[in-house]
Amino acid sequence: MFNNILKQVGDYAKESLQAAKYIGQGLAVTFDHMSRRPITVQYPYEKLIPSERFRGRIHFEFDKCIACEVCVRVCPINLPVVDWEFNKAVKKKELKHYSIDFGVCIFCGNCVEYCPTNCLSMTEEYELAAYDRHDLNYDNVALGRLPYKVTEDPMVTPLRELGYLPKGVIEPHNLPKGSQRAGQHPEDLVKAE
Protein backbone atom coordinates (compact mmCIF):
# COMPACT_ATOMS: atom_id res chain seq x y z
CA MET A 1 0.00 0.00 0.00
CA PHE A 2 2.85 2.35 0.83
CA ASN A 3 4.47 1.57 -2.57
CA ASN A 4 1.17 2.36 -4.30
CA ILE A 5 1.05 5.82 -2.66
CA LEU A 6 4.68 6.52 -3.59
CA LYS A 7 3.97 5.46 -7.19
CA GLN A 8 0.96 7.82 -7.37
CA VAL A 9 3.02 10.72 -5.94
CA GLY A 10 5.81 9.98 -8.43
CA ASP A 11 3.36 9.86 -11.36
CA TYR A 12 1.78 13.13 -10.19
CA ALA A 13 5.22 14.77 -10.05
CA LYS A 14 6.08 13.54 -13.58
CA GLU A 15 2.76 14.78 -14.97
CA SER A 16 3.24 18.15 -13.22
CA LEU A 17 6.72 18.55 -14.75
CA GLN A 18 5.40 17.55 -18.18
CA ALA A 19 2.52 20.05 -17.88
CA ALA A 20 4.98 22.79 -16.84
CA LYS A 21 7.14 21.92 -19.87
CA TYR A 22 4.16 22.24 -22.26
CA ILE A 23 3.05 25.52 -20.64
CA GLY A 24 6.63 26.80 -20.98
CA GLN A 25 6.66 25.89 -24.69
CA GLY A 26 3.37 27.72 -25.23
CA LEU A 27 4.62 30.81 -23.40
CA ALA A 28 7.84 30.73 -25.45
CA VAL A 29 5.78 30.90 -28.66
CA THR A 30 3.66 33.69 -27.16
CA PHE A 31 6.71 35.76 -26.15
CA ASP A 32 8.27 35.14 -29.56
CA HIS A 33 5.18 36.61 -31.26
CA MET A 34 5.06 39.52 -28.80
CA SER A 35 8.50 40.67 -29.93
CA ARG A 36 7.49 40.81 -33.61
CA ARG A 37 6.05 43.83 -35.41
CA PRO A 38 2.24 43.92 -35.62
CA ILE A 39 0.73 42.63 -38.85
CA THR A 40 -2.68 44.26 -38.59
CA VAL A 41 -3.39 47.95 -39.08
CA GLN A 42 -6.35 50.13 -38.14
CA TYR A 43 -7.70 49.98 -41.70
CA PRO A 44 -9.73 53.07 -42.42
CA TYR A 45 -7.14 55.27 -40.72
CA GLU A 46 -3.96 53.39 -41.68
CA LYS A 47 -3.41 51.78 -45.06
CA LEU A 48 -0.71 49.36 -46.08
CA ILE A 49 1.37 50.27 -49.11
CA PRO A 50 0.77 47.60 -51.76
CA SER A 51 3.71 45.70 -53.18
CA GLU A 52 5.14 46.51 -56.58
CA ARG A 53 3.36 43.60 -58.29
CA PHE A 54 0.02 44.14 -56.52
CA ARG A 55 -2.98 43.28 -58.67
CA GLY A 56 -5.57 45.96 -57.99
CA ARG A 57 -8.16 47.65 -60.19
CA ILE A 58 -7.43 47.50 -63.91
CA HIS A 59 -6.53 50.75 -65.71
CA PHE A 60 -7.54 51.00 -69.38
CA GLU A 61 -6.14 53.37 -72.01
CA PHE A 62 -8.74 53.83 -74.74
CA ASP A 63 -6.36 55.27 -77.34
CA LYS A 64 -3.99 52.29 -77.25
CA CYS A 65 -6.65 49.60 -77.62
CA ILE A 66 -6.87 47.98 -81.08
CA ALA A 67 -10.01 45.91 -80.24
CA CYS A 68 -8.20 42.61 -80.80
CA GLU A 69 -10.21 40.96 -77.99
CA VAL A 70 -7.21 39.02 -76.67
CA CYS A 71 -8.21 40.09 -73.16
CA VAL A 72 -11.61 38.42 -73.59
CA ARG A 73 -10.07 35.18 -74.90
CA VAL A 74 -7.52 34.81 -72.09
CA CYS A 75 -9.95 35.76 -69.31
CA PRO A 76 -11.05 32.60 -67.45
CA ILE A 77 -14.60 33.96 -67.22
CA ASN A 78 -14.76 35.96 -70.53
CA LEU A 79 -15.34 39.13 -68.53
CA PRO A 80 -14.23 42.18 -70.57
CA VAL A 81 -16.92 43.49 -72.92
CA VAL A 82 -15.42 44.92 -76.11
CA ASP A 83 -17.73 46.68 -78.59
CA TRP A 84 -16.20 47.69 -81.91
CA GLU A 85 -17.12 48.53 -85.49
CA PHE A 86 -15.16 47.78 -88.62
CA ASN A 87 -14.18 50.95 -90.46
CA LYS A 88 -14.13 50.05 -94.16
CA ALA A 89 -12.31 53.24 -95.15
CA VAL A 90 -9.14 52.44 -93.17
CA LYS A 91 -9.83 48.69 -92.92
CA LYS A 92 -9.42 48.63 -89.15
CA LYS A 93 -11.54 47.95 -86.11
CA GLU A 94 -12.63 51.04 -84.18
CA LEU A 95 -13.30 50.58 -80.48
CA LYS A 96 -16.66 51.94 -79.40
CA HIS A 97 -16.99 50.73 -75.81
CA TYR A 98 -14.98 48.72 -73.27
CA SER A 99 -16.12 47.62 -69.81
CA ILE A 100 -15.17 45.26 -66.98
CA ASP A 101 -17.43 44.19 -64.12
CA PHE A 102 -15.26 44.16 -60.97
CA GLY A 103 -18.01 42.40 -59.05
CA VAL A 104 -17.17 39.29 -61.09
CA CYS A 105 -13.47 39.86 -61.88
CA ILE A 106 -11.04 37.55 -60.07
CA PHE A 107 -8.03 39.88 -60.63
CA CYS A 108 -5.94 37.12 -62.20
CA GLY A 109 -4.07 39.61 -64.42
CA ASN A 110 -4.24 37.52 -67.61
CA CYS A 111 -5.79 40.38 -69.58
CA VAL A 112 -2.95 42.70 -68.56
CA GLU A 113 -0.24 40.14 -69.26
CA TYR A 114 -1.43 39.15 -72.74
CA CYS A 115 -2.52 42.57 -74.05
CA PRO A 116 -0.36 43.22 -77.17
CA THR A 117 -0.55 47.02 -76.92
CA ASN A 118 -0.22 47.34 -73.12
CA CYS A 119 -3.44 49.33 -72.91
CA LEU A 120 -4.36 47.46 -69.70
CA SER A 121 -2.41 47.76 -66.46
CA MET A 122 -2.97 46.96 -62.79
CA THR A 123 -3.18 49.83 -60.30
CA GLU A 124 -2.74 49.87 -56.52
CA GLU A 125 -6.41 50.68 -55.96
CA TYR A 126 -8.19 48.05 -53.92
CA GLU A 127 -11.11 49.94 -52.37
CA LEU A 128 -13.86 48.93 -54.76
CA ALA A 129 -16.73 48.55 -52.29
CA ALA A 130 -20.13 49.78 -53.45
CA TYR A 131 -23.70 49.61 -52.17
CA ASP A 132 -25.03 48.49 -55.54
CA ARG A 133 -23.30 45.74 -57.50
CA HIS A 134 -24.09 47.50 -60.78
CA ASP A 135 -21.75 50.31 -59.69
CA LEU A 136 -18.86 47.84 -60.01
CA ASN A 137 -19.34 47.62 -63.79
CA TYR A 138 -16.67 50.08 -64.96
CA ASP A 139 -16.87 51.45 -68.49
CA ASN A 140 -13.97 52.87 -70.49
CA VAL A 141 -14.26 56.27 -68.76
CA ALA A 142 -14.16 54.83 -65.23
CA LEU A 143 -11.37 52.41 -66.18
CA GLY A 144 -9.29 55.28 -67.56
CA ARG A 145 -9.12 57.19 -64.28
CA LEU A 146 -5.92 56.62 -62.36
CA PRO A 147 -6.19 56.62 -58.56
CA TYR A 148 -4.16 59.37 -56.91
CA LYS A 149 -2.44 57.16 -54.37
CA VAL A 150 -3.36 54.73 -51.63
CA THR A 151 -1.64 56.48 -48.76
CA GLU A 152 -1.91 60.12 -47.79
CA ASP A 153 1.56 60.08 -46.21
CA PRO A 154 3.67 62.82 -47.88
CA MET A 155 6.83 60.78 -47.26
CA VAL A 156 5.59 58.12 -49.68
CA THR A 157 5.65 59.40 -53.26
CA PRO A 158 4.87 56.86 -55.97
CA LEU A 159 7.22 56.88 -58.95
CA ARG A 160 4.36 57.75 -61.31
CA GLU A 161 4.03 61.16 -59.62
CA LEU A 162 7.66 61.94 -60.37
CA GLY A 163 6.88 61.39 -64.06
CA TYR A 164 4.68 64.50 -64.15
CA LEU A 165 7.32 66.87 -62.81
CA PRO A 166 9.38 69.15 -65.08
CA LYS A 167 12.74 67.82 -66.18
CA GLY A 168 15.39 68.05 -63.45
CA VAL A 169 12.92 68.53 -60.56
CA ILE A 170 12.61 65.63 -58.14
CA GLU A 171 10.77 67.29 -55.25
CA PRO A 172 7.27 68.59 -56.13
CA HIS A 173 7.33 71.09 -53.26
CA ASN A 174 10.19 73.07 -54.85
CA LEU A 175 8.19 74.03 -57.94
CA PRO A 176 7.99 77.74 -58.64
CA LYS A 177 4.44 79.08 -58.88
CA GLY A 178 2.92 78.88 -62.33
CA SER A 179 5.41 76.31 -63.64
CA GLN A 180 3.95 73.93 -66.20
CA ARG A 181 4.19 70.25 -65.35
CA ALA A 182 4.93 67.63 -67.97
CA GLY A 183 1.80 65.90 -69.23
CA GLN A 184 -1.72 67.24 -69.23
CA HIS A 185 -4.46 67.00 -66.67
CA PRO A 186 -7.94 65.93 -67.84
CA GLU A 187 -9.32 69.44 -67.28
CA ASP A 188 -6.58 70.86 -69.54
CA LEU A 189 -7.60 68.47 -72.31
CA VAL A 190 -11.25 69.54 -72.04
CA LYS A 191 -10.31 73.24 -72.27
CA ALA A 192 -8.11 72.61 -75.31
CA GLU A 193 -10.95 71.00 -77.30
UniProtKB/Swiss-Prot annotation:
Residues 56-85, 96-125 form the 4Fe-4S ferredoxin-type domain. NDH-1 is composed of at least 11 different subunits. [4Fe-4S] cluster 2 binds at C75, C105, C108, C111. Belongs to the complex I 23 kDa subunit family. The keyword Lipid metabolism does not apply. This is NAD(P)H-quinone oxidoreductase subunit I. HAMAP family: NDH1_NuoI. It comes from the Bacteria. It comes from Synechocystis sp. (strain ATCC 27184 / PCC 6803 / Kazusa).
